[in-house]
Regions:
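Aromatic, loop-rich ligand-recognition surfaces of beta-strand-rich domains
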Residues: 1-9, 22-73, 83-156
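Solvent-exposed serine/threonine-rich low-complexity stretches and specific carbohydrate-binding patches
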Residues: 10-20
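Compositionally biased low-complexity segments at domain edges in trafficked proteins
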Residues: 76-80
């Protein structure tokens, strides 16, 4: 992640798009067609609540066998916003195996929000699992989203 970078998704192929159901607990999304790639971008298009915040407690990418791929060597390549004023809400919290920690965007940065994960190697991606914050009214829960998966990094 570099200060001042801005992700450019114009012209990129959308791998999947949809909407999450409001509520707590894991949500699993399966792609109609598997996609090979090393860079996984989740673009949050709108919130469940009427605010600017996006938050993710934990996140898995599903591999060829339909099971989560190893997160051991993952890195956050890009996050458009991270809340660090009121807490340590950096994007790497989405794969720290702690459901009580989470990534959260700054409240004055409007949607859409983007997060790019470097999976460290090319994987056959068949879907993903998303865990919103486990609190009353699931603050920061994403509603509509798009996913992009590529073997090479995105443009910034």
């Amino acid at each position: 992640r570099k200060d001042g970078e801005k992700l450019k998704l114009t012209g990129e192929k959308v791998g999947h798009e949809g909407a999450f159901t409001p509520g707590n607990g894991w949500q699993e999304v399966r792609f109609a067609t598997p996609v090979k790639g090393r860079y996984f971008c989740l673009e949050a298009l709108s919130p469940q609540a009427n605010d600017n915040i996006a938050a993710i407690a934990e996140f898995d990418v599903l591999g060829a066998d339909g099971k989560p791929v190893s997160r051991e060597h993952w890195k956050i390549r890009y996050a458009d916003s991270e809340e660090t004023r009121s807490g340590n809400r950096t994007a790497d919290k989405i794969f720290d195996l702690q459901e009580s920690t989470f990534w959260m965007t700054v409240d004055n940065v409007a949607y859409p929000h983007q997060l790019v994960i470097d999976l460290s190697k090319v994987e056959t991606v068949t879907g993903f699992r998303y865990l919103p914050r486990a609190e009353k009214n699931y603050p920061g829960m994403i509603k509509e989203y798009r996913v992009y998966v590529k073997p090479a990094d995105f443009k910034y």
